[in-house]
């Protein structure tokens, strides 16, 4: 069973400072659609600010019970996996309640580091509950990465350019870990 947590604090800004980033509609919609497509159990939007969580809840409410549900039922269905939480600890607690065991925490980063887990290695070990932790802004702060059990290798294409949106990275990660492999 796989979970995704989208962490908005603590993350880096473009100058390398620790910051809190804003929740965006695009991240919510696109990550929920990818999560639902690939069978992710829950997508957690993790933000410490009550006002930002309120914005996220309002967006979800419009699509889940408001006018958006009638206008676009598929989007409503995709958003059903999404939960808003104040901390990564609360997301982990919820996933633990659902599965009966604490998930393996897997940090993501665009930087290559020694000892990273490959997609192939992780894919073979998804028999345990696993939480993929995505960072917004310019990536997860060390305090988040350091508490994880594993750090996933970066996503590389055929070029040296390596700056994907978190939405694109999330979709690629879902496909590499959960996608059908008969191509």
Predicted feature descriptions by range:
Residues 1-110, 171-182:
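RNA substrate-binding interface of SAM-dependent RNA methyltransferases
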Residues 25, 85, 125-129, 159:
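Generic hydrophobic-segment detector
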Residues 40, 102, 128, 148-149:
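Short, well-ordered alpha-helix to beta-strand connector turns
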Residues 52-55, 114-115, 140, 161-162:
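Secondary-structure boundary/capping motif
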Residues 55-59, 119, 164-165:
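Short secondary-structure transition/capping segments
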Residues 107-144, 154:
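Long, charge-patterned amphipathic alpha-helical coiled-coil/hairpin "stalk" segments used as oligomerization
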Residues 138-183:
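Structured adenosyl-cofactor binding patch, chiefly the S-adenosyl-L-methionine
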């Amino acid at each position: 069973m796989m979970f995704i947590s989208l962490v908005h604090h603590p993350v880096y800004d473009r100058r390398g400072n620790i910051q809190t980033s804003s929740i965006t509609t695009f991240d919510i919609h696109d990550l929920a659609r990818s999560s639902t497509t690939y069978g992710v159990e829950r997508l957690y939007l993790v933000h410490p600010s009550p006002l930002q969580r309120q914005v996220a809840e309002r967006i979800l409410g419009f699509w889940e019970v408001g006018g958006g549900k009638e206008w676009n039922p598929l989007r409503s269905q995709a958003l059903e996996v999404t939960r808003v939480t104040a901390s990564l600890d609360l997301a982990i607690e919820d996933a633990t309640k659902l599965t009966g065991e604490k998930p393996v925490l897997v940090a993501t980063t665009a930087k290559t580091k020694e000892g990273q887990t490959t997609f192939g290695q992780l894919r073979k070990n998804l028999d345990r509950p696993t939480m993929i932790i995505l960072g917004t802004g310019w990536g997860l702060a060390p305090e988040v990465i350091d508490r994880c059990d594993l750090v996933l290798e970066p996503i590389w294409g055929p070029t040296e350019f390596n700056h994907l949106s978190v939405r694109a990275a999330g979709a690629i990660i879902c496909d590499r870990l959960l996608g059908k492999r008969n191509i």
